[in-house]
Protein backbone atom coordinates (compact mmCIF):
# COMPACT_ATOMS: atom_id res chain seq x y z
CA UNK A 1 0.00 0.00 0.00
CA UNK A 2 1.32 3.42 -0.98
CA UNK A 3 1.35 6.23 1.58
CA UNK A 4 -0.76 9.18 0.42
CA UNK A 5 2.12 11.47 1.39
CA UNK A 6 4.40 9.70 -1.10
CA UNK A 7 4.69 11.65 -4.37
CA UNK A 8 2.76 10.11 -7.23
CA UNK A 9 5.79 10.62 -9.48
CA UNK A 10 9.38 10.98 -8.31
CA UNK A 11 12.11 11.50 -10.93
CA UNK A 12 15.75 11.32 -9.87
CA UNK A 13 18.86 11.88 -11.96
CA UNK A 14 16.99 11.42 -15.25
CA UNK A 15 19.45 11.56 -18.12
CA UNK A 16 19.07 11.04 -21.86
CA UNK A 17 22.00 11.08 -24.25
CA UNK A 18 21.41 10.55 -27.95
CA UNK A 19 24.26 8.65 -29.54
CA UNK A 20 26.30 10.41 -32.19
CA UNK A 21 27.22 8.88 -35.50
CA UNK A 22 30.48 7.05 -36.09
CA UNK A 23 31.69 7.25 -32.53
CA UNK A 24 30.93 10.94 -32.00
CA UNK A 25 29.95 12.00 -28.49
CA UNK A 26 26.30 12.65 -29.26
CA UNK A 27 23.82 15.04 -27.66
CA UNK A 28 23.00 15.24 -23.95
CA UNK A 29 19.31 16.22 -24.12
CA UNK A 30 18.40 15.66 -20.46
CA UNK A 31 21.08 16.05 -17.79
CA UNK A 32 20.35 14.72 -14.30
CA UNK A 33 16.80 16.02 -13.88
CA UNK A 34 15.02 15.73 -10.50
CA UNK A 35 11.38 16.56 -9.76
CA UNK A 36 8.27 15.27 -7.99
CA UNK A 37 4.53 15.50 -8.59
CA UNK A 38 2.05 15.04 -5.75
CA UNK A 39 -1.40 13.53 -6.14
CA UNK A 40 -3.82 16.07 -7.59
CA UNK A 41 -1.02 18.50 -8.41
CA UNK A 42 0.05 20.21 -11.64
CA UNK A 43 3.76 20.68 -12.24
CA UNK A 44 4.50 23.08 -15.07
CA UNK A 45 7.69 22.30 -16.98
CA UNK A 46 8.74 25.40 -18.89
CA UNK A 47 11.64 26.35 -21.12
CA UNK A 48 12.57 27.40 -24.62
CA UNK A 49 12.37 25.07 -27.60
CA UNK A 50 15.19 22.54 -27.36
CA UNK A 51 15.53 22.80 -23.58
CA UNK A 52 14.69 19.10 -23.13
CA UNK A 53 11.09 19.37 -21.90
CA UNK A 54 9.49 16.93 -24.34
CA UNK A 55 12.42 14.52 -24.17
CA UNK A 56 12.01 14.47 -20.39
CA UNK A 57 8.31 13.63 -20.79
CA UNK A 58 9.01 10.84 -23.26
CA UNK A 59 11.61 9.37 -20.91
CA UNK A 60 9.14 9.49 -18.01
CA UNK A 61 6.71 7.47 -20.13
CA UNK A 62 9.53 5.28 -21.42
CA UNK A 63 8.56 6.09 -24.97
CA UNK A 64 12.26 6.95 -25.00
CA UNK A 65 14.63 4.84 -22.93
CA UNK A 66 16.50 6.95 -20.34
CA UNK A 67 20.28 6.68 -20.34
CA UNK A 68 20.34 6.89 -16.53
CA UNK A 69 18.17 7.80 -13.55
CA UNK A 70 14.96 6.55 -11.98
CA UNK A 71 11.27 7.26 -12.60
CA UNK A 72 9.23 6.12 -9.59
CA UNK A 73 5.51 6.11 -10.35
CA UNK A 74 3.08 4.91 -7.69
CA UNK A 75 6.06 3.47 -5.82
CA UNK A 76 7.54 1.49 -8.74
CA UNK A 77 10.59 2.41 -10.78
CA UNK A 78 9.38 2.35 -14.38
CA UNK A 79 12.94 2.18 -15.69
CA UNK A 80 13.33 -1.31 -14.19
CA UNK A 81 10.09 -2.83 -15.51
CA UNK A 82 9.82 -5.34 -18.33
CA UNK A 83 7.67 -4.51 -21.36
CA UNK A 84 4.83 -6.63 -19.97
CA UNK A 85 4.99 -4.99 -16.54
CA UNK A 86 5.21 -1.54 -18.11
CA UNK A 87 2.06 -2.14 -20.15
CA UNK A 88 0.05 -2.57 -16.96
CA UNK A 89 1.46 0.59 -15.40
CA UNK A 90 0.75 2.63 -18.51
CA UNK A 91 -2.95 2.35 -17.75
CA UNK A 92 -2.31 4.86 -14.99
CA UNK A 93 -0.22 7.37 -16.95
CA UNK A 94 -1.37 8.87 -20.25
CA UNK A 95 -0.34 11.66 -22.60
CA UNK A 96 -2.01 14.51 -24.50
CA UNK A 97 0.03 15.76 -27.44
CA UNK A 98 0.36 19.17 -29.05
CA UNK A 99 -1.24 18.25 -32.38
CA UNK A 100 -4.62 16.57 -31.77
CA UNK A 101 -5.07 15.69 -35.44
CA UNK A 102 -1.74 13.87 -35.67
CA UNK A 103 -2.52 11.93 -32.48
CA UNK A 104 -5.83 10.59 -33.87
CA UNK A 105 -5.99 7.85 -36.52
CA UNK A 106 -7.97 9.38 -39.43
CA UNK A 107 -9.26 5.91 -40.35
CA UNK A 108 -11.02 5.52 -37.00
CA UNK A 109 -14.22 7.28 -36.11
CA UNK A 110 -14.25 9.10 -32.78
CA UNK A 111 -15.97 6.27 -30.94
CA UNK A 112 -13.33 3.79 -32.07
CA UNK A 113 -10.49 6.17 -31.18
CA UNK A 114 -11.77 6.84 -27.66
CA UNK A 115 -12.56 3.16 -27.08
CA UNK A 116 -9.17 1.96 -28.34
CA UNK A 117 -7.43 1.99 -24.91
CA UNK A 118 -10.36 0.05 -23.44
CA UNK A 119 -10.18 -2.52 -26.23
CA UNK A 120 -6.40 -2.91 -25.95
CA UNK A 121 -6.68 -3.56 -22.21
CA UNK A 122 -9.74 -5.80 -22.72
CA UNK A 123 -12.01 -3.71 -20.55
CA UNK A 124 -15.75 -4.32 -20.92
CA UNK A 125 -17.89 -5.77 -23.66
CA UNK A 126 -18.46 -3.92 -26.92
CA UNK A 127 -21.76 -2.47 -25.69
CA UNK A 128 -20.19 -1.47 -22.36
CA UNK A 129 -17.39 0.30 -24.22
CA UNK A 130 -19.93 2.18 -26.34
CA UNK A 131 -21.68 3.39 -23.19
CA UNK A 132 -18.39 4.45 -21.65
CA UNK A 133 -17.40 6.32 -24.82
CA UNK A 134 -20.67 8.28 -24.65
CA UNK A 135 -19.94 9.17 -21.01
CA UNK A 136 -16.37 10.23 -21.84
CA UNK A 137 -17.49 12.44 -24.72
CA UNK A 138 -20.06 14.09 -22.46
CA UNK A 139 -17.37 14.62 -19.83
CA UNK A 140 -15.23 16.60 -22.30
CA UNK A 141 -18.17 18.60 -23.66
CA UNK A 142 -18.98 16.69 -26.86
CA UNK A 143 -22.28 15.13 -27.89
CA UNK A 144 -22.64 11.36 -27.88
CA UNK A 145 -23.45 11.52 -31.61
CA UNK A 146 -19.87 12.65 -32.21
CA UNK A 147 -18.79 9.02 -31.84
CA UNK A 148 -19.85 8.18 -35.40
CA UNK A 149 -17.93 11.03 -37.00
CA UNK A 150 -14.27 11.23 -38.04
CA UNK A 151 -11.47 13.51 -36.78
CA UNK A 152 -11.36 15.65 -39.94
CA UNK A 153 -14.96 16.72 -39.30
CA UNK A 154 -14.01 18.55 -36.09
CA UNK A 155 -12.23 21.78 -35.25
CA UNK A 156 -8.82 21.79 -33.58
CA UNK A 157 -10.30 22.44 -30.16
CA UNK A 158 -12.85 19.65 -30.58
CA UNK A 159 -10.13 17.25 -31.69
CA UNK A 160 -8.16 18.07 -28.56
CA UNK A 161 -11.26 17.28 -26.51
CA UNK A 162 -11.42 13.90 -28.25
CA UNK A 163 -7.75 13.28 -27.45
CA UNK A 164 -8.40 14.19 -23.81
CA UNK A 165 -11.40 11.83 -23.68
CA UNK A 166 -9.18 9.01 -24.90
CA UNK A 167 -6.49 9.94 -22.36
CA UNK A 168 -8.89 9.65 -19.41
CA UNK A 169 -10.61 6.47 -20.66
CA UNK A 170 -8.51 4.20 -18.42
CA UNK A 171 -8.93 6.37 -15.30
CA UNK A 172 -5.25 7.37 -15.15
CA UNK A 173 -3.56 8.96 -12.15
CA UNK A 174 -1.20 11.15 -14.19
CA UNK A 175 -1.53 12.85 -17.57
CA UNK A 176 1.47 14.30 -19.36
CA UNK A 177 0.30 17.33 -21.36
CA UNK A 178 2.89 18.26 -24.00
CA UNK A 179 2.06 21.77 -25.26
CA UNK A 180 -1.66 20.85 -25.46
CA UNK A 181 -2.94 24.32 -26.41
CA UNK A 182 -0.07 25.67 -28.50
CA UNK A 183 -1.70 24.77 -31.83
CA UNK A 184 -5.11 26.22 -30.90
CA UNK A 185 -6.73 29.61 -31.43
CA UNK A 186 -6.56 32.02 -28.52
CA UNK A 187 -10.22 31.73 -27.53
CA UNK A 188 -10.08 27.93 -27.65
CA UNK A 189 -6.94 27.77 -25.50
CA UNK A 190 -8.82 29.08 -22.48
CA UNK A 191 -11.62 26.54 -22.97
CA UNK A 192 -9.23 23.59 -23.11
CA UNK A 193 -7.27 24.80 -20.07
CA UNK A 194 -10.50 25.11 -18.13
CA UNK A 195 -11.56 21.63 -19.24
CA UNK A 196 -8.28 20.17 -17.98
CA UNK A 197 -8.74 21.95 -14.65
CA UNK A 198 -12.33 20.73 -14.32
CA UNK A 199 -11.29 17.15 -15.05
CA UNK A 200 -8.52 17.44 -12.48
CA UNK A 201 -11.04 18.54 -9.85
CA UNK A 202 -13.55 15.82 -10.77
CA UNK A 203 -11.18 12.90 -11.27
CA UNK A 204 -8.29 13.77 -8.96
CA UNK A 205 -5.79 13.88 -11.81
CA UNK A 206 -2.18 14.99 -11.62
CA UNK A 207 -0.58 16.76 -14.59
CA UNK A 208 2.93 17.18 -15.89
CA UNK A 209 2.18 20.23 -18.02
CA UNK A 210 4.78 21.20 -20.62
CA UNK A 211 4.70 24.63 -22.24
CA UNK A 212 6.92 27.45 -23.40
CA UNK A 213 4.26 30.11 -22.74
CA UNK A 214 4.71 31.40 -19.20
CA UNK A 215 1.18 32.75 -19.21
CA UNK A 216 -0.18 29.24 -19.70
CA UNK A 217 2.13 27.87 -17.01
CA UNK A 218 1.03 30.60 -14.59
CA UNK A 219 -2.64 29.79 -15.19
CA UNK A 220 -2.53 26.02 -14.69
CA UNK A 221 0.42 25.14 -12.45
CA UNK A 222 0.71 24.63 -8.70
CA UNK A 223 4.48 24.40 -9.00
CA UNK A 224 6.86 25.15 -11.84
CA UNK A 225 10.21 23.74 -12.95
CA UNK A 226 12.29 25.84 -15.34
CA UNK A 227 14.41 23.89 -17.79
CA UNK A 228 17.48 25.13 -19.67
CA UNK A 229 19.78 23.01 -21.83
CA UNK A 230 18.61 19.75 -20.33
CA UNK A 231 18.76 20.83 -16.69
CA UNK A 232 16.20 22.16 -14.23
CA UNK A 233 17.61 25.49 -13.09
CA UNK A 234 14.79 26.64 -10.82
CA UNK A 235 11.76 25.08 -9.17
CA UNK A 236 9.14 26.14 -6.66
CA UNK A 237 5.58 27.33 -6.24
CA UNK A 238 4.39 28.81 -9.52
CA UNK A 239 3.27 32.12 -8.04
CA UNK A 240 6.57 32.60 -6.19
CA UNK A 241 8.89 31.60 -9.04
CA UNK A 242 7.09 33.72 -11.60
CA UNK A 243 6.75 36.72 -9.28
CA UNK A 244 10.29 36.60 -7.87
CA UNK A 245 12.50 34.49 -10.16
CA UNK A 246 15.89 33.67 -8.67
CA UNK A 247 17.68 32.29 -11.72
CA UNK A 248 18.82 34.60 -14.55
CA UNK A 249 17.33 32.25 -17.16
CA UNK A 250 13.90 32.42 -15.52
CA UNK A 251 14.14 36.21 -15.44
CA UNK A 252 15.12 36.20 -19.11
CA UNK A 253 12.08 34.07 -19.99
CA UNK A 254 9.80 36.46 -18.14
CA UNK A 255 11.19 39.52 -19.88
CA UNK A 256 11.37 37.99 -23.36
CA UNK A 257 8.18 38.99 -25.18
CA UNK A 258 7.92 37.98 -28.85
CA UNK A 259 7.60 40.67 -31.53
CA UNK A 260 5.28 42.44 -31.97
CA UNK A 261 5.17 43.14 -28.23
CA UNK A 262 1.83 44.90 -28.08
CA UNK A 263 0.01 42.23 -30.06
CA UNK A 264 1.50 39.44 -27.95
CA UNK A 265 0.55 41.13 -24.69
CA UNK A 266 -2.99 41.68 -25.98
CA UNK A 267 -3.19 38.03 -27.01
CA UNK A 268 -2.15 36.81 -23.56
CA UNK A 269 -4.49 39.18 -21.75
CA UNK A 270 -7.33 37.97 -23.98
CA UNK A 271 -6.71 34.32 -23.11
CA UNK A 272 -6.54 34.83 -19.36
CA UNK A 273 -9.51 37.21 -19.32
CA UNK A 274 -11.57 34.59 -21.11
CA UNK A 275 -10.38 31.92 -18.69
CA UNK A 276 -11.50 34.01 -15.71
CA UNK A 277 -14.86 34.69 -17.38
CA UNK A 278 -15.45 31.01 -18.13
CA UNK A 279 -14.54 29.97 -14.60
CA UNK A 280 -16.80 32.65 -13.10
CA UNK A 281 -19.75 31.53 -15.25
CA UNK A 282 -19.39 27.96 -13.95
CA UNK A 283 -19.58 28.92 -10.27
What are these regions (language model features)?
Residues 1-256, 268-283:
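ABC transporter nucleotide-binding domains
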Residues 260-265:
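Proline-centered turn/helix-capping motifs that create local helix->coil transitions or kinks
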Amino acid sequence: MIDEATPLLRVRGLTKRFQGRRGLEGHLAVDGVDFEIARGETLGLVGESGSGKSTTALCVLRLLEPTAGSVEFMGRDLTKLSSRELRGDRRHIQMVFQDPYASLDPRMNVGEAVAEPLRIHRIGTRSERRRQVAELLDLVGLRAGSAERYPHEFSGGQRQRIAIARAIALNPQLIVCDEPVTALDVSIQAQILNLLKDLQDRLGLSYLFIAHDLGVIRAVSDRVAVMQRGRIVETGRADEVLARPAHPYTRALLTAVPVPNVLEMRRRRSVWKEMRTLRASET
